[in-house]
Amino acid sequence: MKRTLIIAIGVVALLIVGFTISGVAQETQSNKESRQAQHEARQQQRAQRLAEYREHLDSTILSHNYRFVPETMQQLPAGMMRNLQNPCYEIIVWSEAVDVCIPFLKGYTPPYYPVVFNYVLSSVQGYIVEQTDYGWHVTFQSTMFTATTFTFSFEIYSHYGAATQTISSPFYNSMQYTGNIFGI
């Protein structure tokens, strides 16, 4: 009798443990499915936000109303990279003018001397906007009230909002700036 009772208790205990493990396994499977659904929803939300950002940046560039804020500058070829901390440095492109306030190193051979281009250009020549695989390529030219023609070239990356801007001239080494594009 004792033996039967011990066997019965053992069987009941095994059944309880079995049901508990089965319930935990079902709950774990349910949690995995729930997490997978949440993960897919977050991926879709991020993809939608990225697409909306690209569309916003595309419309900003096409409107000809944007602001470039440089973070670094480098004289080409192979000049020293300099961080720009002054928040006043920017190039603002409007449909009717271009506002330039940006540092530049003049000179073809050392010693170079730093200047700040601080002009409002009421007219620019050859304003061209081209869509590329990675974003946009914008170029225009201006004399900036000198005898030298300066070419401004923007490479704008739609995926992450960054831009590389190059100012070139036949009489000076080119300067390259990296920064961000903002709508105005």
What are the residue ranges of the model-derived segments?
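Bacterial Sec-dependent N-terminal signal peptides
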Residues: M1-N31
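Amphipathic/hydrophobic helical signal segments and adjacent flexible N-terminal regions
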Residues: G23-D58
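Helix-rich interaction surfaces within compact, conserved domain-sized segments
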Residues: N31, V124-I184
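N-terminal post-signal-peptidase region of extra-cytosolic proteins
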Residues: E52-R54, E71-N86
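A short, Trp-centered hydrophobic/proline-enriched beta-strand micro-motif
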Residues: D58-Q74
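Structural motif
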Residues: N65, A97-D99, A162
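Generic short beta-strand segments
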Residues: V69-L76, V100-F104
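Mid-length scaffold segments of soluble, non-membrane domains
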Residues: R82-G135
